[in-house]
Amino acid sequence: MSQTRAEATPASDLTPVVAVLGATAAAVAIWVVATLAGAELTVSFGPGQPIQKITVVNVVVAALVGSLAGWGLLALLRRFTTNARAVWTVVATIFALLSLGGPLSTISSAGTKAWLVAMHLAVATVTIVGLRRTRGR
């Protein structure tokens, strides 16, 4: 009987790019499903404040900003700490949970809040899982 060992394949240099684009694609996919399902993705940030429609551009920009910020923080931590991945994962998870305050604090329907929370969680999950796989300490 022969024994085979699975070798861990190193992450590609493209892994962070794939993570950022994947997080963005996940948010856009949820936005598309919500829109096709007839969800009215509009929010207001307080009484008397204007109602804002959540567009695909809003979704793309928010996902890119969040995931690129995560990538930047991970790169900085790798430069200055020896346990960057662990520290970054904790910080990223805290920021992901705090980001839920945005959609949950808006004046919008429960359905809109649910769709927005789903987008936030999708971006956070893909970003955290994807960037943890990148090379580095």
Describe the role of every protein-language-model region.
Residues 1-13:
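Short, Lys/Arg-rich, polar N-terminal cytosolic tail immediately upstream
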Residues 101-115:
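Membrane-helix boundary connector in multi-pass membrane proteins
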Residues 42-55:
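Perimembrane loop-to-helix junctions flanking transmembrane segments
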Residues 15-19, 122-137:
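Membrane-water interface at the C-terminal end of transmembrane alpha helices
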Residues 22-30, 61, 65, 69, ...:
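Lipid-exposed faces of alpha-helical membrane segments in multi-pass integral membrane proteins
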Residues 10-35:
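N-terminal signal-anchor transmembrane alpha helix
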Residues 30-38, 74, 78, 131-135:
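Membrane-water interface at transmembrane helix exits
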